[in-house]
């Protein structure tokens, strides 16, 4: 996984979104803005990207995206239920056509037997009401996990929502 691949995906997503007149948004936790950075590294990205959110804390997920406090308490931030609510929340907050959300444990600390370091949950939502969630287990150091998560996010958004 490389930054070059992330850049290539951003270019491809930008072209596809521009052709459709669509907007994409993102709500990031463990990637800390890496997805938004990759998108905005592309010249002209203001034609398909208006805003993204870095919601690192549970309070930010709740306050900015409307993730239920009970969902956060019951399932934890790194869960299918939370990324589902994050994706819908950011889609609504940004008024976008496609939304990506990500929450995971990049390491080196913070993992558990149930959710080891490298566990990342993803949420994707479209203005058509469709929501998709996915879980991945990545290996490597913190930077590698974050990069793999950003690439997976863009690959999946492109394949399942933008080109579909």
UniProtKB/Swiss-Prot annotation:
| UniProt keyword list | Hydrolase, Pyridine nucleotide biosynthesis
A Gene Ontology annotation in the biological process aspect, one of them, is: pyridine nucleotide biosynthetic process
Q: Which InterPro entries match?
A: CinA-like_C, CinA_C
Q: What is its EC number?
A: 3.5.1.42
Any keyword Hydrolase? yes
Presence of keyword Hydrolase: yes
Q: Which GO terms describe its molecular function?
A: nicotinamide-nucleotide amidase activity
State the source organism's domain of life: Bacteria
Q: Which reaction does it catalyse?
A: beta-nicotinamide D-ribonucleotide + H2O = nicotinate beta-D-ribonucleotide + NH4(+)
User: What assembly does the database describe for this protein?
Assistant: Homodimer.
The task this protein performs is described as: Has NMN aminohydrolase activity, not active on other substrates.
Family assignment from sequence similarity: Belongs to the CinA family. PncC subfamily.
Protein name, entry field: Nicotinamide-nucleotide amidohydrolase PncC
Q: Which gene encodes it?
A: pncC
